[in-house]
């Protein structure tokens, strides 16, 4: 893999991690385009580190607060919201890894993501701010996040949808969704490093790794800040239409054996 391919994959990871269109699904397509085995598993890990850096930079005040106040309500909300994904991930890790490798359901998963994004805008706007989020809210939002263990189910999309259904206001829904992404991204990095140390990763140059990581961090930061502002006044339907179109194209190509 050359540095330009790593740069492009970094853009894909950075933007799609925080736009509600599934980063894993798009990375799968990117890997297929560049004909990469296992994506370059180590590169995948570094791309996730890039998006983690983006979240840390954007939420630096919140993370400083969490470090100083490890037993705060915000910390407990993040823990409660992470529990469903941890449980599902540990119980069904091998099953979902097999699905991710084959990509056989990816088109249908994009369609499911689109359905939830479309239905979310049917809800009346809520008024809950960060201080109003309950542990029940966090658990339900986290349960939707657990569904994103399927490769083309958008994590940010599902958590934003769940947050809107729990009557968080639109800005807070995106804000909490991205904050909740931190434990999920850390978990993905840990699992990927485990596979790397087992020798499953292909060799990639240091230049490509650095370029991919910085690209993911830069475009991830842009996506976080843009999406929070976008959701204040705009609909999720445009993303629903996009993933529906993408899903239909993928299913068609799979059934005609082109993809």
Swiss-Prot record:
Annotated TM spans: 1-21, 39-59, 71-91, 99-119, 133-153, 173-193, 208-228, 239-259
Gene (UniProt): uppP4
Domain of life of the native organism: Bacteria
Top-level enzyme category: hydrolase
Keywords: Antibiotic resistance, Cell membrane, Cell shape, Cell wall biogenesis/degradation, Hydrolase, Membrane, Peptidoglycan synthesis, Transmembrane, Transmembrane helix
Name of the featured protein: Undecaprenyl-diphosphatase 4
Molecular function in Gene Ontology: undecaprenyl-diphosphatase activity
Membrane topology, record value: Multi-pass membrane protein
Similarity remark: Belongs to the UppP family.
Catalytic reaction equation(s): di-trans,octa-cis-undecaprenyl diphosphate + H2O = di-trans,octa-cis-undecaprenyl phosphate + phosphate + H(+)
């Amino acid at each position: 893999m050359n540095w330009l391919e790593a740069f492009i994959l970094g853009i894909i990871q950075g933007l799609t991690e925080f736009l509600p269109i599934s980063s894993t699904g798009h990375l799968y397509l990117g890997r297929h385009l560049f004909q990469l085995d296992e994506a370059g598993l180590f590169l995948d890990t570094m791309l996730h580190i890039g998006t983690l850096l983006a979240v840390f930079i954007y939420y630096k005040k919140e993370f400083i607060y969490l470090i100083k106040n490890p037993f705060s309500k915000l910390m407990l909300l993040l823990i409660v919201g992470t529990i469903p994904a941890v449980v599902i991930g540990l119980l069904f890790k091998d099953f979902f890894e097999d699905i991710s490798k084959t990509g056989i359901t990816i088109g249908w998963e994009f369609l499911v993501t689109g359905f939830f994004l479309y239905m979310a805008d049917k809800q009346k706007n809520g008024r809950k701010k960060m201080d109003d989020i309950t542990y029940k809210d966090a658990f339900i939002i986290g349960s939707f996040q657990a569904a994103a263990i399927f490769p083309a189910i958008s994590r940010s999309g599902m958590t934003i949808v769940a947050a809107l259904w729990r009557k968080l206001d639109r800005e807070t829904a995106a804000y909490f969704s991205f904050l909740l992404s931190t434990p999920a991204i850390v978990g993905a990095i840990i699992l990927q490093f485990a596979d790397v140390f087992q020798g499953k990763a292909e060799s990639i140059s240091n230049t490509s790794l650095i370029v991919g990581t910085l690209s993911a961090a830069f475009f991830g930061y842009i996506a976080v800040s843009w999406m929070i502002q976008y959701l204040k006044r705009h609909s999720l339907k445009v993303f629903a239409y996009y993933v529906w179109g993408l899903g239909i194209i993928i299913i068609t190509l799979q059934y005609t054996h082109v993809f």
